[in-house]
A protein has these predicted regions:
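A short loop-to-beta-strand structural motif that recurs across blades of beta-propeller domains
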Residues: 56-60, 117-121
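Gly/Pro-rich loop segments of beta-rich domains
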Residues: 27-39, 65-98, 127-142
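Bacterial N-terminal signal peptides that target proteins for export
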Residues: 1-11
């Protein structure tokens, strides 16, 4: 039974990732037109968390509805693309530079923030983003 559930979860995640990569006719959220999904994981309630390297946020996807779960939209650069940043704070006040992958970890989720060279932790009970490991400095020592 557990194997069947894992297979169904994987299949649903794959279908969701493919559907997000294709342009949508009707934009229900910014994710439908500006998303660059790179990581995905399922949540206990059946929704999904998707990391978005373009918008610099983590989305929560439930059915055809998507809302920002972690991170904040930042100002655009010269070409209008979000810049991102680094800030450990509440979910709706935190900044990511390049959220790459997401995975369940302890009582929350680990998110690799590739451009900041850190792994961030989103705790379920605290609704907070905090750095779990790494340093913002580039190099092989972190």
């Amino acid at each position: 039974m557990k194997l069947q559930k894992r297979i169904l979860t994987f299949a649903a995640a794959a279908m969701l990732a493919l559907s997000m990569a294709l342009p949508c006719a009707a934009a229900e959220s910014a994710m439908d037109t500006l998303c660059a999904p790179s990581g995905i994981t399922s949540m206990p309630d059946g929704s999904f968390l998707v990391t978005d390297t373009y918008n610099k946020v983590v989305w929560r996807v439930e059915g055809r509805t998507s809302t920002v779960y972690g991170g904040v939209a930042t100002v655009g650069d010269l070409y209008g693309q979000p810049i991102g940043g680094y800030n450990d704070s509440a979910l709706n006040d935190s900044y990511f530079k390049e959220p790459w992958a997401v995975a369940p970890f302890l009582d929350g989720y680990a998110v690799s923030d590739a451009a900041n060279n850190v792994v961030r932790f989103i705790a379920h009970d605290k609704n907070k983003v905090q750095t779990a490991t790494g340093q913002r400095a580039k190099g092989s020592m972190n």
